[in-house]
Amino acid sequence: MSVIELKNINKYFGSVISREHVHHDINFSAERGQLILVVGPSGSGKSTFLTIAGGLQTPTSGSVEVEGQAVDDLTKAQRDQLRLNRIGFVLQSYNLVPYLKVKEQFEFVNKVKRQGNINKDDLAGLLEQLGISQLVDKYPSELSGGQTQRVAIARALYADPDIVLADEPTAALDSEKVAEVGRLFKDLAETRNKAVVVVTHDIRLLDFADKTYEILDGKISLKDKEHMLDR
């Protein structure tokens, strides 16, 4: 069973007279244990696709379902709880709390989710895996772009969501760190049985993906690795 499914999604911006059609009848699903890439050129609507999938933005028509439950049928409070407890976001804006040190970012997640004390062993392992153990006492303003991105990834994964939605998570990383992030997402999907959806234009992640979709001219289609490498 799909953990998340988009059915006949259409998204328009603008008025009826000057309407921009971003998505045309998008159908997409992800199962637990899968790492899925969604690729496409700049301006193709990849980020809009991700925010619709995560319930941060509503489609003009169509539905989003999480394990068979239509998100539109939920109350606002239920949708908020769904995003808080079931979905982990890694967005391009990072959204780190500027006045909290790196280690405090994770304590903040625990407080928001009301999970009690932080699991220091789990956190230490995650920070080491991402190569950011030495950053725990730094503020976001003291981090490089790549460091900030890795902290944002760690924070999303530490919350232990069922679904991870990542928007260009390797944009500020070198090839070595890209491979580390790819392996981390792959491990998260396979060993922790999560559904991981990564929106990217970074073909270096193709080696780690179970499936790759392309968004082009508002439509989505499944592509094989060889097709994408030949582009």
Model-derived features with residue positions:
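Conserved ABC transporter NBD signature motif
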Residues: 62-70
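Conserved ABC ATPase signature
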Residues: 139-143, 147-149
